[in-house]
């Protein structure tokens, strides 16, 4: 498989830039992307099997990988959920698929959000990982407007090897993540 544009950009220009910025003594100290996880909670999936199937197809179309169905660990009467019922779907992307998805997310999908001024720089977890929520699946060019039965969002988590938020923010900014100015 050929190297993606973003991965070659990372290896050729971003790594030397981060080594100079943070005074790393070893190339392996430079933060890198580990994985990207996409999660979608489906409250109505317990009653409606078609919505589960539609979500699986949409996420598979967007990521290029079939998602795993997450199931309820225990019964909750208030939500009308029994143990083992499907409550969401999740997919973990690594290596080439991760770089390809991240590149499409940053260059194609995020700019298609209405009134987009950048993503919040406050969504880091303290260890250099970043999470963002997407309100509708229509921002992805792979999803056709006519095939959508209901607008659903998803959570996208970007896991890095960065030791703190500052390193993680520098890595994602170099990779093209459009952070909002504070």
From Swiss-Prot:
PROSITE patterns, per this entry?
A: RIBOSOMAL_L5
Q: Which GO terms describe its biological process?
A: translation
Q: Report the coiled-coil segments.
A: none
Signal peptide (residue range): none
Q: Which UniProt keywords apply?
A: Ribonucleoprotein, Ribosomal protein, RNA-binding, rRNA-binding, tRNA-binding
Among its keywords, does the record have NAD? no
This protein's GO cellular component annotations are: ribonucleoprotein complex; ribosome
Gene Ontology molecular function terms on file: rRNA binding; structural constituent of ribosome; tRNA binding
Pfam families per record: Ribosomal_L5, Ribosomal_L5_C
UniProt KW Nucleus keyword: no
Top-level taxon of the source organism:
Bacteria
The family annotation for this protein states: Belongs to the universal ribosomal protein uL5 family.
Oligomeric form and interacting partners: Part of the 50S ribosomal subunit; part of the 5S rRNA/L5/L18/L25 subcomplex. Contacts the 5S rRNA and the P site tRNA. Forms a bridge to the 30S subunit in the 70S ribosome.
Q: What does this protein do?
A: This is one of the proteins that bind and probably mediate the attachment of the 5S RNA into the large ribosomal subunit, where it forms part of the central protuberance. In the 70S ribosome it contacts protein S13 of the 30S subunit (bridge B1b), connecting the 2 subunits; this bridge is implicated in subunit movement. Contacts the P site tRNA; the 5S rRNA and some of its associated proteins might help stabilize positioning of ribosome-bound tRNAs.
Query: Per its record, how is this protein called by name?
Result: Large ribosomal subunit protein uL5
Q: Which organism is it from?
A: Nostoc punctiforme (strain ATCC 29133 / PCC 73102)
Q: Which gene encodes it?
A: rplE
